[in-house]
């Protein structure tokens, strides 16, 4: 996966760097290590579906008929949601975040991003959304096995909103409230979506 990613690393960097425009590297090794980091992360993303499929093949013999039926659609849905989360973050959240922070520029104060620092910001901002978008799938699976109900989710709504902002503060690449809110809001919307879908499923 890493070899494939490295082959296309220039294209990947062009895509990832687009929201910020021109960047600089402050240390002789900074550009090289940024290339390596993007290649490794890209390789992990490429390899993830294969790894998950191998894990599924390993545990499949021990599953019940009901669990096997459920697992047939879990993997493709999980991969799809992860991809949607990445795309959502890149096209909507990341440009808004970059624009917000560049808005502090003045005639005397101009932004000059380091490629290493910017790439750390991008990866720590974009990748978590892939996992955040798995939330509906996790909650629906728990509901499928009667471990939670839509009523339970309704009663825990306020707690989840608080948890969303705490998670936003933990995984946000910067300590400001804007970044935390940009992470927390999609989590809350996904929670409400999960609640709605779970309520529909339970009525059937």
What are these regions (language model features)?
Residues 1-204:
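Membrane topogenic/interface segments and analogous intrinsically disordered interaction regions
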